[in-house]
Design a protein with these regions (language model features):
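The feature captures the beta-strand-to-loop junction immediately N-terminal to the Walker
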Residues: 35-37
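Conserved ABC ATPase "signature" C-loop
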Residues: 213-214, 220
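Conserved ABC ATPase signature
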Residues: 110, 135-139, 143
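ABC ATPase nucleotide-binding domains
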Residues: 232-260
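Conserved ABC ATPase "signature" region
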Residues: 98, 113-131
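Catalytic Walker B motif of ABC-type/P-loop ATPase nucleotide-binding domains
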Residues: 160-164
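Conserved ABC transporter NBD signature motif
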Residues: 57-65, 74
Length: 260
């Protein structure tokens, strides 16, 4: 069964439509990359799929409408990493990651051994184990981003939605993050990740969905979506798309003089 399915989904802000109508699916064990220029509607779409923004049309999770799910039930099924990643409280990094286990615990209960193992694995994937005792407010922005990503991974949900999680990370940690998403997918979890790095998207995602002005401009395998023609049309850039090491590499080299 398709895990997450949106049909004729629309989102309006201030009475004006900003997303849709569009349709989108997410299968078990799949990493889907969400592409598009600034203002294309990526963040708004992810919020709607997380059940955090009112929407028209339909959006279902394993056949159940998102609108019919309680916040508690949704938190057991969907984890959401927003684009804003400022940590506003002085808590140890390990405690921050442990917050991802809240949906699975009774109020006031201690972490179980299973909880601790899941937290430790999430911290390992995001390379924040050495920061466990550091205050989250006293580490770098990139380290904060990785700690918050570890918290979302520790939520251990079938669906993970991540809004530009690689932004601000060094190249090694960008690759490590995408590799972590792939490892989650290999275990049957489903990931939608919005990205501006086209090479990361093309190399690590099973499918790509390109948005433009709130609608789907293209969808398919990376080689079908990341093309010079589409990049010119949607992003307004000239780009060289080549194959390096058996995977696509994308290099924007100038402005195309198109609509952007």
């Amino acid at each position: 069964m398709t895990r997450l399915l949106a049909r004729d989904l629309t989102v309006s802000l201030g009475g004006s439509p900003v997303v849709g109508p569009l349709s989108l699916r997410l299968e078990p064990g799949e990493v889907v990359g969400l592409l598009g220029p600034n203002g294309a509607g990526k963040s708004t779409l992810l919020r709607a799929l997380a059940g955090l923004a009112p929407h028209g049309g339909s959006a279902t999770l394993d056949g159940t409408p998102l609108a019919q799910m309680s916040d508690a039930a949704r938190a057991l099924r969907i984890a959401y990493l927003p684009q804003a990643r400022t940590v506003g409280w002085a808590v140890a990094v390990e405690r921050l990651v442990e917050l991802g286990r809240i949906p699975w615990r009774r109020f006031g209960s201690a972490l179980s051994e299973t909880d601790r193992a899941i937290v430790a694995e999430a911290m390992r994937l995001m390379d924040v184990g050495p920061l466990a005792r550091r205050l989250a407010t006293e580490i770098s922005g990139g380290e904060q981003a990785r700690a918050l990503a570890a918290r979302v991974i520790a939520q251990d949900t079938p669906v993970l939605l991540a809004d530009e999680p690689a932004a601000g990370l060094d190249p090694a940690h960008q690759i490590a993050m995408m590799a972590a998403f792939r490892s989650l997918a290999a275990k049957g979890r489903s990931v939608i990740v919005s990205l501006h790095d086209l090479t990361l998207a093309a190399r690590w995602c099973d499918r790509l969905v390109m948005l433009d002005a709130g609608k789907v401009a293209a969808e398919g395998a990376p080689a079908e979506v990341v093309t010079p023609a589409l990049l010119g049309q949607v992003f307004g850039v000239e780009a060289v798309v080549s194959t390096v090491g058996g995977a696509l590499a994308v290099a924007p080299i100038g402005l195309s003089g198109g609509p952007r």
